[in-house]
């Protein structure tokens, strides 16, 4: 334990001093941005709260391990007519490599529009179903989710986020407890994602993009005769077309990026494995592609 004591007693105080002195931090690292300094402060707060065993390359907090940033360079000047649709994240229970995969697809397909299909956070602690009594506390799970989401936000600073059923769990609990919405903070304020727009659904190029709680995409295109892009169903990743004499519509399920080995996903251990992937739609909504992520 000596090396951990050294970190806490010798290194951590210096990091705190630097993070609390913006001028000094920017002198040490001239390119240091205020948001990066704030990010350092948050890391320190989490270390102080939960302790630290070692600093590793582990992409999420595992036990009491400090997370290494997975944020990637922002892809600039993408074509706004090309859409990247990112599957359910369920942070902090997201596959570490899923961020890199989605960022690669954005650049490969020159996507200037980014949409998260919903359930960006899991809120396992607040589930209406049984939650794991040995899992994270409410505060720790949220801290871990916020920290993980910060990597996604730094990589995709401008995005539209569809609100999923897991995202709204806390809002539902507050509502059923008689708490006025005036007391509830906005998603972007809780998650520190001021550049993201949170919406129930969005229409682009006459495509209905929604979380997917109303049935599968292939069924909805039959009943609504409108193209649909959805998430929610972790085991489905596909594009189906419905063609008539005067119309062509498609239904896309974009898969997900969940870590099936995490305790929060234990409810699905006896079902099909999740389809890890994302979707892109090119040429103003005319060319949908479902892209599986290579595993292993």
Enumerate the language-model features and the residues they cover.
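Structural motif
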Residues: 81-83, 113-115, 207-208, 227-229
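Core catalytic region of metal-dependent phosphoesterases/phosphodiesterases
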Residues: 86-191
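Mobile, glycine- and charge-enriched loop segments
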Residues: 63-96, 108
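Short, solvent-exposed alpha-helical "recognition" segments
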Residues: 40-61
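Short, amphipathic alpha-helical "recognition" segments used to contact nucleic acids or chromatin
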Residues: 2-21
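Short acidic low-complexity segments
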Residues: 188-205, 216
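Conserved beta-sheet core of the metallophosphoesterase superfamily
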Residues: 205-293
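Short, basic interhelical loop/turn and adjoining N-cap
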Residues: 22, 26-46
């Amino acid at each position: 334990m000596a090396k951990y004591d050294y970190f806490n007693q010798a290194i951590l105080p210096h990091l705190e001093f630097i993070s609390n002195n913006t001028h000094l931090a920017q002198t040490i690292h001239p390119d240091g941005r205020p948001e990066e300094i704030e990010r350092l402060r948050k890391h320190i707060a989490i270390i102080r709260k939960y302790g630290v065993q070692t600093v590793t390359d582990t992409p999420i907090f595992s036990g009491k391990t400090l997370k290494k940033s997975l944020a990637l360079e922002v892809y600039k000047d993408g074509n706004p007519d090309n859409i990247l649709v990112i599957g359910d994240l369920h942070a902090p229970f997201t596959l570490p490599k899923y961020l890199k995969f989605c960022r690669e697809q954005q650049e490969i397909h020159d996507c200037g529009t980014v949409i998260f299909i919903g359930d960006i956070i899991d809120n396992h602690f607040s589930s209406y179903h049984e939650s794991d009594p040995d899992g994270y506390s409410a505060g720790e799970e949220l801290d871990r989710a916020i920290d993980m989401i910060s990597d996604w936000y730094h990589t995709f600073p401008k995005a539209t986020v569809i609100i999923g059923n897991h995202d709204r769990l806390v809002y539902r609990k507050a509502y059923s407890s008689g708490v006025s919405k005036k007391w509830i903070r906005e998603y972007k304020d809780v998650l520190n994602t001021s550049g993201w727009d949170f919406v129930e659904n969005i229409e682009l190029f006459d495509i209905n993009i929604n979380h997917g709680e109303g049935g599968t995409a292939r069924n909805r295109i039959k009943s609504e005769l409108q193209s649909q892009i959805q998430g929610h169903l972790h085991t489905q990743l596909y594009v189906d077309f419905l063609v008539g004499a005067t119309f062509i519509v498609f239904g896309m399920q974009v898969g997900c990026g969940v870590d099936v080995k995490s305790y929060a996903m234990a409810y699905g251990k006896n079902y099909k494995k999740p389809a890890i992937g994302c979707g892109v739609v090119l040429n103003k909504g005319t060319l949908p592609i479902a892209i599986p992520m290579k595993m292993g």
